[in-house]
């Protein structure tokens, strides 16, 4: 009988494995450096910068209305959130109160965007897991949401719905559009129910992702994690509960406790019905009146800040207004603070789970790459 020789600690060599900048499981280009010992990740480093477009710098000196339109280009998934928050900055600084009907339409657009983002998350996560059927199913359900966004905003990616004082008249909701939205929500509700029954309740799938990429609650708070990734650790924090725009709507804040891939997946599955609930309330109680107030006047303002809750967490916009133009624009997206969680989640897990640990945080590196500071040029 041959005695098995156990390797000494000195025999284990740390290996660096690089993934990216282009990788089959990545929706966007970014680089991941994994430092591995015996196929277990000991350290992870995510490098961004490939998607840099300098949007904040381009906004400098532009007329406020034009700069607001440019913010849509920050992110193709959360385009509505960016222009909405940028418009909110101007409205807060200029003291503009928009018509309630316009606010309801903005909420409908934002929750539709949250739906399509969460379905994209489920589709991408299923693909990384190797379940192509579930991935295609999520994309199929998402298509209903995309068509509703196209119907209201005129495009499937960038809608340009929000403007200073309300929403564009072309985004007005008539009876036909309201009926289409109601029917669409019925279809999406049926779709997510079937998806959950077949995917979330599958013991093979759940056993594959349970206990993987764990982010403890204390660590999540320390890393300043935001959005569903933070709520997946048990922290009951959703900025929508503090936003006056959401005061007319009744919905629940979803939380999970384990902070692993399973908890993050369940977060999105369970948040989808809440968004459907908000949209149904909005179309049922849609106020009458105008969708835009054009009686406002432009004047100089010091730096104004605005925070809103978007599909990935807290989005921050700020700028000052001088002679009707934007000054000192700053945008902070949720993925900027969540990068630390993505790196932490990889540590201690097998190398084959590394990309899954990153995907669970729903990264969007394109919106994170907005500005670049060059030191000692």
PLM features: what roles do these ranges have?
Residues 1-377:
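Active-site bordering "gate/hinge" segments
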């Amino acid at each position: 009988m041959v005695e098995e020789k156990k390797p000494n600690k000195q025999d284990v060599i740390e290996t660096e494995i690089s993934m990216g900048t282009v990788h089959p499981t990545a929706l966007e280009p970014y680089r991941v450096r994994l430092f591995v010992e015996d196929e277990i990740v000991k350290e992870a480093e995510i490098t961004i910068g490939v998607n840099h477009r300098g949007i904040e710098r381009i906004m400098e000196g532009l007329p406020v209305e034009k700069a607001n339109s440019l913010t849509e280009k920050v992110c193709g998934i959360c385009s509505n959130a960016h222009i909405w928050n940028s418009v909110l900055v101007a409205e807060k600084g200029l003291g503009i109160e928009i018509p309630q009907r316009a606010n309801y339409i903005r909420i409908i657009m934002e929750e539709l965007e949250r739906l399509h983002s969460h379905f994209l998350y489920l589709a991408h996560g299923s693909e990384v897991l190797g379940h192509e059927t579930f991935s295609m199913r999520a994309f199929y359900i998402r298509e209903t949401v995309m068509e509703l966004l196209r119907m209201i905003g005129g495009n499937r990616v960038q809608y340009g719905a929000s403007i200073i004082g309300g929403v564009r008249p072309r985004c007005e909701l008539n009876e036909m559009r309201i009926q289409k939205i109601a029917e669409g929500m019925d279809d999406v509700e049926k779709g997510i129910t079937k998806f959950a029954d077949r995917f979330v309740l599958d013991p093979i799938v759940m056993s594959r992702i349970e206990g993987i990429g764990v982010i403890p609650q204390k660590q999540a708070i320390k890393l300043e994690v935001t959005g569903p990734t933070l709520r997946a650790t048990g922290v009951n924090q959703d900025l929508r509960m503090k936003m006056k725009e959401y005061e007319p709507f009744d919905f629940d804040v979803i939380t999970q406790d384990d902070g692993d891939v399973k908890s993050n997946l369940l977060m999105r599955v369970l948040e989808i019905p809440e968004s459907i609930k908000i949209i149904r309330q909005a179309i049922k109680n849609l106020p009458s009146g105008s969708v835009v107030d054009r009686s406002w006047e432009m004047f100089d303002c010091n730096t104004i800040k605005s925070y809103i809750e978007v599909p990935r967490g807290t989005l921050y916009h700020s700028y000052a207004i001088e002679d009707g133009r934007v000054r000192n624009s700053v945008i902070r997206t949720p993925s900027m603070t969540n990068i630390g969680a993505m790196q932490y989640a990889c540590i201690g897990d097998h190398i084959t789970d590394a990309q899954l640990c990153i995907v669970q945080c729903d990264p969007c590196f394109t919106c994170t790459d907005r500005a670049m500071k060059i030191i000692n040029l």
